[in-house]
């Protein structure tokens, strides 16, 4: 299940791509299949271990083009361990809403993106997220450690990106059929996965993600119709202009552990 449109991002074989807050690796895997040199970056060691295992398996099965490669790196999004202009493309999918100092994270992303490079930032869309917060205090911080700490409006996110020296260049909503699922979960309890309605709806989402026919045709049609209205995520694409003056680099760097599975 991808949130970012790689064609709009402009990803090409051999591009250096940072997947910030890579999580389970969905965007990193697709970028690797397209021949990018991917850094999957996250704070969660367990998820990074799983991502490293998957990328190694992809390489051994011949799913990685010659131009591609990957590394898994643990670190702090507000103190990235890379020189200025290290990456051609950046994806930050569903991560900024977890970071208290999101301006610092956006500034770091701008710093490590090369002039002329592009970035895709995705966060929960305002309407879908507002309903979730209204339905359940268990859905967000402080009730959930590491949970969502804010709700974004697209205009505010664009303003933050401009302040970091980036030029927003377009946006779209995604995952329209996922919003009702999360509203249902928030109604019965975000951790109540045994609820019959939640389990039934989850099966529908699995059909959609797996492309199970004929149901996936219906779910994907529904998603295209619903996403502009109640999409769970908003994606904003931006470019770093050649003349930009990026925020000063953070001088201190975290201790970072990395695992490269291809080069």
For the regions a language model picked out, list residue spans one by one:
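Residues lining the SAM
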Residues: 93-96, 122
